[in-house]
From Swiss-Prot:
Subcellular location per the Swiss-Prot or TrEMBL entry: Cytoplasm, Cytoskeleton
One Gene Ontology CC term in the entry: cell cortex
Family matches, as SMART domains: PROF
Subunit structure and binding partners: Occurs in many kinds of cells as a complex with monomeric actin in a 1:1 ratio.
Record-linked InterPro entries: PFN, PFN_euk, PFN_sf, Profilin_CS
GO molecular function, one term: proline-rich region binding
Keywords: Actin-binding, Allergen, Cytoplasm, Cytoskeleton
Native organism taxonomy: Eukaryota, Viridiplantae, Streptophyta, Embryophyta, Tracheophyta
Organism: Citrullus lanatus (Watermelon)
PROSITE patterns: PROFILIN (PS00414)
Pfam families: Profilin
Function of the molecule: Binds to actin and affects the structure of the cytoskeleton. At high concentrations, profilin prevents the polymerization of actin, whereas it enhances it at low concentrations. Has a high affinity for poly-proline.
Protein name listed in UniProt: Profilin
Family: Belongs to the profilin family.
Amino acid sequence: MSWQAYVDDHLMCEIEGNHLTSAAIIGQDGSVWAKSENFPQLKPEEITGILNDFNEPGTLAPTGLYIGGSKYMVIQGEPGAVIRGKKGPGGVTVKKTALALVIGIYDEPMTPGQCNMIVERLGDYLIEQGL
């Protein structure tokens, strides 16, 4: 299965009538493995900030989590494994795997829990595969 198929079939899938606004699988080196059409362009410093927070949980909390220039308030995640952010009625979930970052961005009517489930389910699968 191509990386694009993982994004299209497993991240942009419908859940209870809702789906993510955009999603991507990004290598920890910053390379885009696959993304939805409208996923924002990540800046190198945004990827560095995300990786730093996974290595030292809490480093993004004071400044916020930035994805494509949009600022998200960091909310409770799982230190070293999942970063969650909130912005108005939407937000973002970032799951770290051995080699990649799985990122899902949502807006109402999708709920934070639905976004978490979609992103973390694929992330857990990739971890099981050694990716």
